[in-house]
């Protein structure tokens, strides 16, 4: 299989974790942000995870510099455009980019301006490249419940205009789900689709709760459903798609190597999986490389690839019209 040339669907990709190193250097200079060095390799060390990373919390520290750089509309528009551009070059036909609007208000932008800027970058890229994109608005679990209401209130105005879903992200604690039951009910009623980061660390029950209490249609990662039989069976029976990011899971020590990752086992047991990068820069990987690693490890064939692709199309939050077009890309 020529994996580079095959069409791809990416459903789990964080904007601020996928910033080009050279762009970070330019923006740091433009914004007057002092770094110890502006040399490429030194700045890369600030953005890309090291082999010494020991946990998800350690991994999340790589988002500090991007947060400082993405406080102006033109900067957000640029990185959104560049992410779409990078994805298109490896034949990603559709991507759902997620980011947390409330992290970009430090220099006076409103949430409305933040969301508009990212959508503008996505739409601009669609004019130049054979790729389509939409936005998922992430809310951070270490922020207040009220902050989720704020995101819903502003974000609902962009449903059908570039925003498709809401997400809960950040550090994961056991049993985090229950306090979000009412606010996620409001999100669904406001037109948001729902995907939730859960089971990324060792808590399979979080996945079950996210589906049953929050109405999650997809799960970000879902790695640890194997340690909760009820969660495993629920995901399988309901056809919930797991947005799986093996390299990221290795980086955060969820698993130690590709051979230990359950993605292929889940796939062969008819659990719906999507393969994504999570954070292209932080994990230093693109989607073609991720597929190559999975292919080498588990010897997936074209039928496996096609099934994952079509499952990903069905699990996407885009329009039915676009889904039909995306399906045609893989019919060979």
UniProtKB/Swiss-Prot annotation:
Please, which domain of life does this record's source organism belong to? Bacteria
Query: Which family is it part of?
Result: Belongs to the metallo-dependent hydrolases superfamily. Adenosine and AMP deaminases family. Adenosine deaminase subfamily.
Record organism: Clostridium perfringens (strain SM101 / Type A)
Q: What is its EC number?
A: 3.5.4.4
Provide the cofactor list for this protein: Zn(2+)
**One GO term describing the cellular component:** cytosol
Q: Which UniProt keywords apply?
A: Hydrolase, Metal-binding, Nucleotide metabolism, Zinc
The job of this chain, per UniProt, is described as: Catalyzes the hydrolytic deamination of adenosine and 2-deoxyadenosine.
Q: Which Pfam families match?
A: A_deaminase
- Which reaction is the catalytic activity of this chain? adenosine + H2O + H(+) = inosine + NH4(+); 2'-deoxyadenosine + H2O + H(+) = 2'-deoxyinosine + NH4(+)
Q: What class of enzyme is it?
A: hydrolase
Q: Cross-referenced SUPFAM superfamilies, in alphabetical order?
A: Metallo-dependent hydrolases
Gene Ontology terms describing biological process: adenosine catabolic process; hypoxanthine salvage; inosine biosynthetic process; nucleotide metabolic process; purine ribonucleoside monophosphate biosynthetic process
Residues the record marks as active site: 200
Question: Mind telling me what this protein is named?
Answer: Adenosine deaminase
Site Important for catalytic activity: which residues? 221
- Give a GO molecular function annotation for the protein: zinc ion binding
Q: How is the cofactor bound?
A: Binds 1 zinc ion per subunit.
**Residue numbers binding substrate:** 14, 16, 170
Respond yes or no to whether keyword Transcription regulation is given for this record: no
Q: Which first-to-last residue range defines the signal peptide?
A: none
Q: Give me the residues that bind Zn(2+), please.
A: 12, 14, 197, 278
């Amino acid at each position: 299989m020529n994996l580079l040339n095959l069409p791809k669907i990416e459903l789990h990709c964080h904007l601020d974790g996928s910033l080009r190193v050279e762009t970070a250097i330019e923006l740091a200079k433009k914004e007057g942000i002092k770094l110890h060095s502006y040399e490429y390799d030194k700045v890369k060390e600030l953005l890309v995870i090291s082999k010494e990373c020991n946990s998800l919390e350690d991994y999340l520290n790589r988002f500090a510099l991007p947060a400082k750089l993405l406080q102006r509309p033109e900067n957000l528009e640029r990185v959104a455009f560049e992410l779409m551009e990078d994805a298109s070059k490896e034949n990603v036909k559709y991507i759902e980019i997620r980011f947390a609007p409330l992290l970009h208000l430090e220099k006076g932008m409103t949430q409305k301006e933040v969301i508009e800027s990212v959508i503008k970058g996505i739409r601009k890229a669609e004019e130049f490249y054979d790729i389509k994109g939409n936005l998922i608005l992430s809310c951070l679990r270490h922020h207040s419940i009220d902050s989720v209401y704020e995101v819903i209130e502003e974000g609902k105005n962009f449903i059908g205009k570039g925003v498709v879903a809401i997400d809960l992200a950040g550090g994961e604690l056991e049993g985090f789900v229950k306090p979000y039951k009412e606010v996620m009910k409001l999100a669904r009623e406001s037109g948001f689709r729902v995907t939730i980061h859960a089971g990324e660390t060792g808590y399979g029950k979080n996945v079950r709760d996210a589906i049953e209490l929050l109405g999650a249609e997809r799960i970000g990662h879902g790695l640890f459903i194997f340690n909760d039989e009820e969660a495993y069976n629920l995901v399988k029976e309901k056809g919930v798609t797991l947005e799986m990011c093996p390299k990221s899971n290795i980086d955060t020590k969820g698993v130690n190597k590709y051979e230990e990752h359950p993605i292929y086992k889940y796939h062969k047991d008819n659990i719906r999986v999507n393969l994504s990068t999570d954070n292209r820069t932080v994990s230093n990987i693109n989607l073609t490389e991720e597929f190559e690693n999975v292919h080498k490890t588990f010897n997936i064939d074209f039928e496996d690839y096609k099934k994952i692709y079509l499952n990903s199309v069905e699990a996407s939050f885009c329009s039915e019209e676009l889904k039909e077009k995306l399906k045609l890309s893989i019919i060979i």
